[in-house]
Amino acid sequence: MEYAIEMRRELHKIPEPGFKEFKTQAFILDQIRSYPEDRVSYDTFETGVFVRVKGLTGNRTIGYRADIDGLPIEEATGLPFCSEHPGFMHACGHDVHASIALGLLRRIVELPVMDDVVFLFQPAEEGPGGAEPMIKSPLFEKYRPSEMYGLHVAPEYPVGTIASRPGVLFASAREVHITIYGQSGHAAFPHLTIDTVVAQAALIMQLQTIVSRSINPMNCSVITIGKVDAGIRENVIAGRALLDGTMRALNGTDMEKLEQRVRDIIRGIEASFGVKIDLQFGNRYYEVVNDQRVVDKFSSFVKMNANYIECDAAMTGEDFGFMLKEIPGMMFWLGVNNATSGLHQPTLNPDEEAIPFVINLLDHYFREYV
């Protein structure tokens, strides 16, 4: 498995934002083109890649998805193969995800399994979302699998551990972008202005009442405002203010309620403070819902070969949910033993021993158990 670890290190050097993974796509294509054309076929979609490895019978098609984009985070790992792109890093482990797919693909090319195996190297998971356009592409019908699998690295679990659950594994997620317009002016004459900072502060506080007062307390939902911006200097009342945030919910009904309550509160803020507000919702990521039958089959296999944990649902957002709305399948957490640094942190450094572990596990599963 030295090959897969080498792939991870090369990919780690070239993190790229969503739909701009040009070097990453070229690197993946270089690997795929080295295989015999009678065994491996492929197509590109945007900066992603569809790949089919022919099986011995080809009676069914099993799908495996790996996301490939990086994050706008300055790396602080100090690794000898750290990011060569300033301000960008594989801080969510997508380099690991892609290298696992490349290693598994190589294994299956060398030692064919019975079924065809389709690999989806997907762009833009971190945004604006690559799964939905990828499965809506006409190419998807050419590669459509009967079952779909995917994983995500989990720093909190040790190497050798797989964690998942039937039903909802990850939450539905949607970005919120709000611009407040008022009237700027001198700080000494607030009565001649419309202060967007005061409206911004009130809006932030009111948004935080939605989950506690509009959502069933037995359900899990989150609204987080992660970015605010307003003003140009201390003695000028701001005529414009910005808020960016995210909403998460474990079911679609609650997500719709969150959206409606945001609209309601914004109308009230406009009336109360005399401002005008532009509200934009980003792409919605659907819940990742694991198929009961697939989870039962996979977890039974893992329990015989590794450590399996049935975990709780997480408020993490993942656009793999789009694929699982179309195809029965599952996603699971892969332990990578990095307890001191979590996802989206500049020091994330997954234990590379997890790479050969899960390649061997999935190869065995696809070969003998699926």
UniProtKB/Swiss-Prot annotation:
InterPro entries for the chain: AcetylDAP_deacetylase, Amidohydrolase, Bact_exopeptidase_dim_dom, Peptidase_M20, Peptidase_M20_dimer
EC number per UniProt: 3.5.1.47
UniProt record similarity statement: Belongs to the peptidase M20A family. N-acetyldiaminopimelate deacetylase subfamily.
Enzyme class, spelled out: hydrolase
Protein name: N-acetyldiaminopimelate deacetylase
GO BP annotations listed: diaminopimelate biosynthetic process; lysine biosynthetic process via diaminopimelate
Function: Catalyzes the conversion of N-acetyl-diaminopimelate to diaminopimelate and acetate.
SUPFAM superfamilies reported in the protein's UniProt record: Bacterial exopeptidase dimerisation domain, Zn-dependent exopeptidases
Database matches in HAMAP family: DapEL
Source species, domain of life: Bacteria
Pathway: Amino-acid biosynthesis; L-lysine biosynthesis via DAP pathway; LL-2,6-diaminopimelate from (S)-tetrahydrodipicolinate (acetylase route): step 3/3
Keyword Hydrolase attached: yes
